[in-house]
Amino acid sequence: MKILHVCSELYPLLKTGGLADVLGALPQAQNQIGLDARVLLPAYPAIIAGIPNTQVVAEFDNFAGHVVLRYGEYNGVGIYLIDAPHLYGREGNPYHDAYYNDYGDNYKRFALLGWVGAELATGLDSWWRAEVVHAHDWHAGLCAAYLFNKGRPAKSVFTIHNLAYQGQFSYHHLYEIGLPTGMFHVEGLELFGQISYLKSGLFYSDASTAVSPTYAQEITTPEFAYGLQGLLSGLKAQDRLVGILNGVDENIWHPNVDQYIPHHYKLKYMAGKKKNKAELQAYFNLPQDESALAFVMVTRLTEQKGVDLLIESADEIVKQGGQLMILGSGAPHLEQGIRELAERYPQNIAVKIGYDEALSHLMVAGGDVILVPSRFEPCGLTQLYGLQYGTLPLVRKTGGLADTVVDSTSESIKACTATGFVFESATPEALRHCLQRAFALWQKPRAWAIVRTDAMAQDFSWRKAAEQYRALYERL
């Protein structure tokens, strides 16, 4: 079965979030179970630099101007690149300029991505024709609309990685992107008086997926649906919306092979974890104290990620003699709040504003607890990395966090199912109480070791997800 993944990021060449990690691993896992998966991407400078050897598949002019479609390989996966420098030849973030202003031609840049995705199901490459076009997030949402317009020559699947980003553009762009005005309708592309690329993906695809079972349920409710609850609950009722958990790329995220950490370790040989903790404490200029409970957080600094909840309750970590290390960037007021914490408690709290791939690996490997107190979290990958590395996740019960972390209670520890710490209410008080429970378990080294062992024994391999996607494709 020939699968075309249509997306806008690919780890490690270009990454702004978890979407890139998924596309860096899922196609490879699908090929390993006998599918023929390829990826379609815009030819951003970072992508071209990483895939320099390509051949021309097609050259054409359409609503987006002059376009060259190229084909190459990366990590054994076939990659199509849409080479249109006037649209994609911009360094840095693929969606906005250095001042965080969305590019004014995003409607055209991502319409072209969807258009080429549909054309690859109708013979644009005479050697390979997609049987399933699998589009990811709003950037690729128009794939399904173009396929619908062509009489549905292939099956279509749309994956929601984050429903909060909807790709909404003015109605008057419709004629510029080659779609009939009849599609601008509540039973179509229209959402709140605008074109919604995300809604297009949901409405016109044969099936949609969310990146965890709980998130697939949550987005049918007004709190999480951003005005799409009617459409989403309808899809759920028809069994056209399912949740499939993301996996972990074990070639990159495994403590026994991780190229970024100085000391490898595994479940049966944990000495390396203590050494990584000492390295991490040294990096952040915190006391190299093995007995201090070390909390780490690697995140975008936004309210969605619960950073404000942590700012309000971090003094609990200090009070109990713990340490807190944070890596991330985001909202200026939250960056400032985190910096002030580090200045107030220099012996206990340290922060690095920005992103650093190598440091993020050392933090996951060297920490004792990884904090993911999100208000909502479609799937979440950092808690999965935490489980893999024996760094117990402390999470809020939402989305993929609820599906992947089992709270440590006396019952779950006895039953060998506990894998971390879970709190329900998105309040500083609830987070504070959960931090206290983590300290209480840390005082019982044998119980802590049991939970850590059970955490590391979890299977979140991409093979599992690849099999679930295959089952979905086969029933379309």
Swiss-Prot record:
It catalyses: [(1->4)-alpha-D-glucosyl](n) + ADP-alpha-D-glucose = [(1->4)-alpha-D-glucosyl](n+1) + ADP + H(+). InterPro entries: Glyco_trans_1, GS/SS, Starch_synth_cat_dom. Keywords: Glycogen biosynthesis, Glycosyltransferase, Transferase. CDD domains: GT5_Glycogen_synthase_DULL1-like. One of its GO terms (cellular component) is cytosol. Disulfide bonds: none annotated. One of its GO terms (biological process) is glycogen biosynthetic process. This is Glycogen synthase.
